[in-house]
Amino acid sequence: MNGVSKTFPPHKKVLSNIYLSFFYAAKIGVIGLNGSGKSTLLKVIAGVEKSFEGELVFSEGYTVGLLEQEPKLNDTKTVRQVVEEGTAEIVAILKEYEEVNAKFAEPMSDDEMNKLIERQGQLSDLIDHHNGWELDNKLERAMDALRCPPEDALIKNLSRGERRRVALCRLLLQEPD
């Protein structure tokens, strides 16, 4: 973080020329008075706040997770659906794998069949690499460890604390650095 500043309209400066660097795997605490810019600083670091002056640089492949004080969750979804968002990449791969397998029941040329078999193999390798065959077990263990509400419960019916646990579960499954 090089020379980061943030001003809210009309002229409230909450961050002024901040320079920070972190060691790999360091645990960082941010303390300060109400309104001093703690949440804004964390949002800048997490990439949520994009309108700031200065430069934010991460090592290649480095990811940051942020659990907001009031997580924004889709009230029409179930606990399971929100938690699955944390593993969106592998969920998408598994979905495509199922679609490819369903296509085997359709009539096709030998060329199409060979392409389908090749794609199935690629997807299977990706699933193996991400340990995707164990996704259901992983989600259940994560939800259980955080004492999330039942997986079929609607988000709109959850308390604030339950919503935060669901959001935390989703965030941890994203495995940010």
Annotated model-derived regions:
Residues 1-177:
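ABC ATP-binding cassette signature C-motif
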